[in-house]
Amino acid sequence: EPRDLELCSRLNLWHVVHNNEQIDWLAAHKTHQPHRVFLKLNSGMNRLGFAPQAYRSAWARLNALPQVDEISLVSHFSDADADRFGVSGITHQMLAWHAASADLPGERSIANSAATLRHAADTEVRGDWVRAGIMIYGGVPDHPEHDAAHWGLQPAMSLSSRLIATQQLAAGDSVGYGSAFVADAPLRIGIVACGYADGYPRHCPTGTPVLVNGVRTRTIGRVSMDMLAVDLSPVPDAGLGSEVTLWGRGPHGSVLPIDDVARAGGTIGYELMCALARRVPVRVA
């Protein structure tokens, strides 16, 4: 909004310009300090940005404004994590990027996490700035083709809880709503204080990986609002208060990649990181 420009000016915040209305706002803005902007090219993702044929005229408009001090060039890949129609997913957008910005001055930024990892040797892709998002948290942008170990990524975000109860099942006993899991033999289970109201994906089925005291095991039955159940067979010493790692770094050097949990739930690690409920206590270490 136009009023945001004053805040950007006072705090020296760089901001993205992606349409002509924003250039109009800048032209009308009485700024305290000149603005530093990223001019967005729509190179093929078709969300934000100027079309390639309009990019240079947008740059010229910005460059003529006394309110603008520095113009950097930016775009965003849609398919950097995979191939697109049988060729590298970035090919069509790099062609548009070159055509629209080849002789324009300014620092450049087009690489997201996937491009930063998969095209690390390409200086044109790396540009002057990379926008590393998911990889900063240890998530893998091209999972399941590659995992965190392949890229040398470490989790920076973990979700953990504890066992609040244990139950001993007999063969034929069921667990949770809808009796979605039925034991085919005697089985000891644990109840974890975490559920979909905390942001854990409700659609995670029986078999979703989880760590108990750093040992990998599985969820069983449906995820409830505030609780979920886990198989304690691999962790016979687990009991009330035992640590449970839903994703991330667990005790004794154990790690449960968030992408393993996301894949089981039919989603991606990005969504899990964004979906934690406000009621979940956050500790920054």
Functional labels for PLM-detected ranges:
Residues 2, 17-20, 49-52, 87-95, ...:
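Electropositive phosphate-/nucleotide-binding environments in soluble metabolic enzymes
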Residues 8, 30-32, 66, 122-124, ...:
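Solvent-exposed alpha-helices and their adjacent loops that cap or buttress functional pockets
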Residues 1-13, 17-26, 118:
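N-terminal active-site wall of soluble small-molecule enzyme domains
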Residues 12-14, 47, 229:
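Short aromatic/hydrophobic contact patches that present stacked aromatics
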Residues 166-285:
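C-terminal accessory subdomain/extension
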Residues 10-21, 32-37, 109, 256-271, ...:
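Electropositive, surface-exposed helix/loop patches at the edges of structured domains
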Residues 14-15, 108, 127-129, 156, ...:
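A residue-level structural signature of the nucleotidyltransferase/glycosyltransferase Rossmann-like core
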Residues 23-36, 41-162, 166-170, 234:
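Active-site loop/helix belt of alpha/beta enzymes
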